[in-house]
Design a protein with these regions (language model features):
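Residues located in well-ordered beta-strands
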Residues: 20, 32, 46, 114-117
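Short acidic-hydrophobic catalytic motif
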Residues: 22-26, 34-37
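Hydrophobic Walker B segment
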Residues: 1-4, 36
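Non-catalytic connector elements of ABC transporters
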Residues: 40, 50-195
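Short, glycine/charged-rich "phosphate-handling" switch motifs in NTP-dependent
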Residues: 6, 18, 27
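Catalytic metal- and UDP-sugar-binding loop of GT-A-like glycosyltransferases, i.e.
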Residues: 9-10, 88
């Protein structure tokens, strides 16, 4: 991936996404692409209400808590009540180390997922923490350095910045591919395009 300027990710003989390494890693269009390159946590939830339409920030309710994410554009903004899927890279997960000590933000709301630490593994300078949310979903967090003060069996709050979460599996994600396919199909049946 670090030697390529364009990458095509295929799934069962179909292109999932074509883009630069940065686009593939940081802005995956589908959950398949998000998990194909690197470690990504895939979460599902229901859109509550857009928190701020000016910056495309929305609040999503999961069974383990509320999280905030940014939609890429106004056109990509899901509607309240819509079920959505988000991807969050393992290195972007942060911890509130004790749910008893969590303070709400300026509005008194606490955003994040409540989860129990089930595994803590050191690999050189990296710490890998596996957690299980209250609804049974596994979350993986990767931290560099050994200063993360969480212990196996402890319940913590998993948090991330809205800008670190990506909406995936949106209907618009494959719109260009479908248009291109229709054009190719049209060319093959008509012998080309006409102006």
């Amino acid at each position: 991936i670090n030697m390529s300027d364009t990458i095509a990710v295929m799934n069962h003989g179909r292109f999932e996404q074509i883009g630069t390494p940065d686009e593939i890693y940081n802005h995956p269009k589908t959950s398949y692409v998000a998990t194909f390159v690197g470690n990504a946590n895939i979460l599902k939830g229901v859109v509550k209400e857009p928190a701020d339409n000016n910056n495309h920030q929305i609040t999503i309710i999961t069974e383990s808590g509320e999280v905030q994410v940014l939609a890429a554009s106004e056109e990509n903004m899901p509607q309240p009540g819509e079920t959505v899927t988000i991807a969050v890279r393992s290195e972007n997960i942060r911890f509130e180390e004790s749910v008893n000590n969590i303070q709400g933000n300026s509005t008194g709301n606490i955003h994040g997922l409540t989860a129990k630490v089930t595994e803590k593994t050191f690999a050189g300078g990296q710490l890998r923490v596996v957690l299980k949310t209250t609804d049974g979903q596994e979350i993986i967090a990767s931290r560099y350095g050994i200063d993360t003060n969480v212990n196996v069996g402890e319940t913590v709050r998993c948090c991330f910045k809205p800008s670190d979460a990506v909406l995936v599996d949106r209907p618009e994600a494959n719109a260009e591919t479908n248009t291109q396919k229709a054009q190719r199909d049209n060319q093959s049946t008509t012998g080309g395009t006409h102006a």
